[in-house]
From Swiss-Prot:
Protein name per UniProt: Small ribosomal subunit protein bS6
Function description: Binds together with bS18 to 16S ribosomal RNA.
Alphabetized NCBIfam families for the sequence: S6
InterPro entries per the UniProt record, alphabetical: Ribosomal_bS6 (IPR000529), Ribosomal_bS6_sf (IPR035980), Ribosomal_S6_plastid/chlpt (IPR020814), Transl_elong_EF1B/ribsomal_bS6 (IPR014717)
Biological processes, Gene Ontology terms: translation
Alphabetically ordered keywords of this record: Ribonucleoprotein, Ribosomal protein, RNA-binding, rRNA-binding
Highest taxon of the lineage: Bacteria
Annotated Pfam families: Ribosomal_S6
A GO term from the CC aspect: ribosome
Homology family: Belongs to the bacterial ribosomal protein bS6 family.
Length: 121
């Protein structure tokens, strides 16, 4: 098993319930293949640097994963096929930090939000 960090952007018109369903679909694939989601972070609805299709904003979501390369390929394939996901990037990591990501820390200080990080050990 290897550690991966995956960030994906979901269309701005998708509800939070539908976002949870998308993440749950990925979680099912990971669990069925003996992988683990170590950390999940919702970074919120953010303005994109440039317009992607008709989207000026997108819901950003981060996953810290402990999975095999085959599972990574399957998740990326599902992301490509999902029309609600407009961009994604998955990178290999040495480890997954238990601390909130810099994006989440920055968002919480700007908006006085409570940081919500789900960590599974």
């Amino acid at each position: 098993m290897s550690f991966y960090e995956s960030v994906f952007i979901i269309r701005q018109d998708i509800s939070l319930n539908d976002i949870d369903k998308i993440v749950d679909d990925f979680a099912k694939i990971i669990k069925d293949n003996n992988g683990t989601i170590i950390k999940k972070e919702y970074w919120g609805l953010r303005t994109l640097a440039y317009k992607i299709g008709s989207n000026k904003k997108g819901h950003y979501y981060f996953l810290g994963l402990d999975i095999t390369p085959n599972v990574k390929e399957e998740i990326e394939r599902k992301m490509k096929l999902n029309e609600n996901i407009i961009r994604f990037l998955t990178i290999k990591a040495d480890a997954i930090s238990s601390e909130p990501s810099p994006m989440l820390k920055n968002q919480s200080t700007e908006n006085n939000l409570v940081i919500d990080v789900t960590i599974n050990n």
